[in-house]
Amino acid sequence: MEVCVDNVDSLINAVQGGASRIELCSALSEGGLTPSFGFLKLAKSLTTIPIHVLIRSRTGDFNYDENDLKIMAEDSKVLVEAGADGIVFGCLDKQANIDVNGCKLILDAVKNNPINLTFHRAFDVVQDPIKTANVIKELGFTRILTSGQVSR
């Protein structure tokens, strides 16, 4: 069972409760944002279960501009180098289709690392989930996090 946490108390409770994987975030009340480097380092010192970090530079939709993508790529690189076992993100265009180029920019930042790649709940707002799932697989993601498109 994966548990999303955005503070140390939640992390400890998740570990003690039997979580098998942690999704580390900040600002879950805002839909989740990228956690700090310090939070990841502390989390890694408190548990040995896999920790995947959310990569999301801001609240709102999943259509990111060039600057957002640069920030997310750099955050991905730094957090993987700091020990993240995986990254969780998703990029869409203005029509709610997968932003392949945006995803590739972030994936390229971590391509030399053996990590897990999860496409997050941006999947829940795409127009064509079957086509999108195939594109996600082709890009190299290993997981899709979804509510079954409840957000649509």
Regions found by a protein language model. Give the residues of each.
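N-terminal entry module detector
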Residues: M1-G31
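Active-site mouth loops of central-metabolism enzymes
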Residues: M1-N7, I55-A73, L117-D128
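Hydrophobic faces of well-ordered beta-strands that scaffold small-molecule active sites
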Residues: M1-V5, I22-L24, A43, I51-I55, ...
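Active-site-adjacent beta->alpha loops and helix N-cap segments on the catalytic face
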Residues: V8-I12, L28-H52, N67-K70, L92-K111, ...
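Conserved, mostly hydrophobic/aromatic
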Residues: A14, L79, I106, H120, ...
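Glycine-enriched alpha-helix->loop->beta-strand junction motifs that scaffold or abut catalytic
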Residues: Q16-I22, T47-P50, G83-G86, K111-P114, ...
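Ordered, amphipathic secondary-structure segments that act as subunit-interaction surfaces
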Residues: E74-C91
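Histidine/lysine/aspartate-rich catalytic loop segments that bind and position anionic ligands
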Residues: P114-R152
